[in-house]
Amino acid sequence: MTRGYIDDSVNHALDSRLIGSSVFQSSDALLDQLLSLHYRAHYHINISTKTKFSALSALLSEVEKLPVLKDELHCAIADNIYGIVFCELDEKEKGLQYVSKKLGSVNGYDRFGRMLDLERLFYKGNVDLAEFSSESWTIPKYSDGLTWHYLQAIIKGLDLSHFKPKTPFQWMLLTLNGSATDSNLLSYSHSLLKKSRFPNADESNNFELEQFHMVLQEHLKINNLNVKKEWEQFIIDSMEKSFQSISVAKSAMLFYRKVDLKRSILNFTNLVNYSNKYYELNKRYPDLLDLVSSYQFILSTCKTPFEPFFMPANVSSDFLKLLERIHNKYSIPIIEKQKALEGSSDVLDLCLASSTASVLSSSWETLYETSASSLPALVDHSQIFYLSNSLQTSLNASVSLKFKFAYHLATLRQIDQCIAYLKKQILTLHPEHFASWHLLALCESCINEDLQVSFKIINSVIQSMCELFDEGRQFTIDEKWQFIHIKLTQLQLVRDMFALEDALEILPEVFELYQRLFSDASEPLGPQINQSNDYLLQKIWLFALELYLENDDIENVKAALDEFKNVTSKYVNLNHNLAQGFVLYTHGHSEKATAEFEKVLHYDSTSVEALIGLAKIVLPDEEANLDTDLKHNSKINQKELHRNSATSLETSSAVARLKFLFEELVDKSIEGYQTSAVWWYLSKIYEIYSDSTRQQEALWRCIKYEELQPVREFKFCNF
């Protein structure tokens, strides 16, 4: 075994521990054992808090049974384990005996030694700013997650009000502390540029300049809404004084996000190219976690393609490979796709370094968001795979991430699993997470035909929200949106459980609630048209119109259509055309109804409602008669269409077009794929074409989604 292999395996083990891994397979078995004990100490401190004291006491016994340590690195790790365990067991004096020791050379493993040093400083407490006066301190790699963990923890306790930084590392302290300003950072950046020059062929880029760009990146992240224009010139000047700098390219990517998205993407492309060239030369990436974070940033920022250099689907594919590479390289457990659904509620409690966990979890979540509207990614379980790993790599999963997971289970029609997850993982810990209560009620409506459970949940949530509102609770934008849709779900339940008249009686309460919640028109739900307050109000009118239409209340139907249209003139809502189409169809005006549905399909060929509306006209229910309007509709050529003539239907261009549109819908649209009526009409079309195999498949899917149909679509609880 060569010395090079030994060093490489030890280096890899130390790198693995720095990123937060728990698996070590170096040529030094005792080192692996010490690193494992170090991981377990962190795990018991941060994860298994309920059994922390007993677990740490047991771990201490294991450390004491180790053989006599002579190697400097071994001794340093053991001292840190003793120190942090004694401190966590409230035996501070014993702990200080270990963490107060001066760290030796640790056999030249400087990056790992830096982490041990910071760990000792943190547990020693009362850190003196003078500790960081030496110019030997440098900004750690982002892959050195434990180093960042302790550095950020120490910074929180430092008084930097009178600190005068002289090195990039010291400027990083000031930046992370929130005390750095654009003016003083720019002043230092100018002095750096003066002593920087483009490197010769045998030279590297200016190290200090490269380090300062890491400072700038943190500054841009913290102040992303207020980026100073002056930084652009510094970035351009830095490019002129460096060769294929990954750090400068990342600064440019971050800077141009708000200024010029295309340039941001171009710099991301440069960053990736430089990283790949580095890999070709060195057989490793300079900082794999940093590269992963850059992918996460750009995919969460840009959802649209910029041909030919940026295609989100291709970038996502490369991103997934990088994520899997980092998991494999550092033996970080990954939930395989085929097992993601089987153990959907059972994820491991990992104790990664906090910065590592943040990058990995947000990366998996970004992959989910990027594919959220992809039907293939839903069907092949890619989405649940992404969400499962986002949850597993998160140190403390947010309620929003947990809700995404629960919502996705509901989307997959894993109703029992979703209910169990909501109750155990969300509502027990977050009893005021109204979206989860709403989702729970919708799930219960799938499996309880009498709807009593759903009705009790909805009424209880509405009562709770009303009380909180009356007490002065300031609801968030998404909570206001949720409140309205919970109220609409209540109306739907009343209509289904009791009578249409009862639902109509409490309909005015929805409009009153809207006025109370959205009295301040200057507070929009979001930047998109479908996130505007007006759009939500139109949704309410659309719901009201459906009730009036069912009640055959022509006067109120017309009034609701007018109110819907008069809400705003800023944009045309295709939902108005849909509503108009169904009103016309209900009253026998098939030709005019067809025109409305066609108008919607012109703008959105995957509109489920428009296609169903058109299908109602082209393929009327067997008990219905074809009306005169339909027979003379030149748009869909129905002159030769007769009720009992399968042959004429088969040759009808209208039926052929419907077949094409429905098949395209179930190939592309998640909503279309999961709508029972879509499969019902497809089965009728396949019957016309004598395709019994596909007819049976369509009927099977129709039954599946009809049986697990919630009282309102799940999308109405997902803001």
UniProtKB/Swiss-Prot annotation:
InterPro entries, sorted: Endocytosis_PI4K-reg_protein, TPR-like_helical_dom_sf
Record's subcellular location: Cytoplasmic granule; Cell membrane
GO (cellular component) term, any one: plasma membrane
GO terms classed as biological process: endocytosis
Keywords: Cell membrane, Endocytosis, Membrane
Membrane topology: Peripheral membrane protein
Known role: Involved in endocytosis.
Family designation: Belongs to the YPP1 family.
Protein name in the entry: Cargo-transport protein YPP1
Organism from which the protein derives: Kluyveromyces lactis (strain ATCC 8585 / CBS 2359 / DSM 70799 / NBRC 1267 / NRRL Y-1140 / WM37)
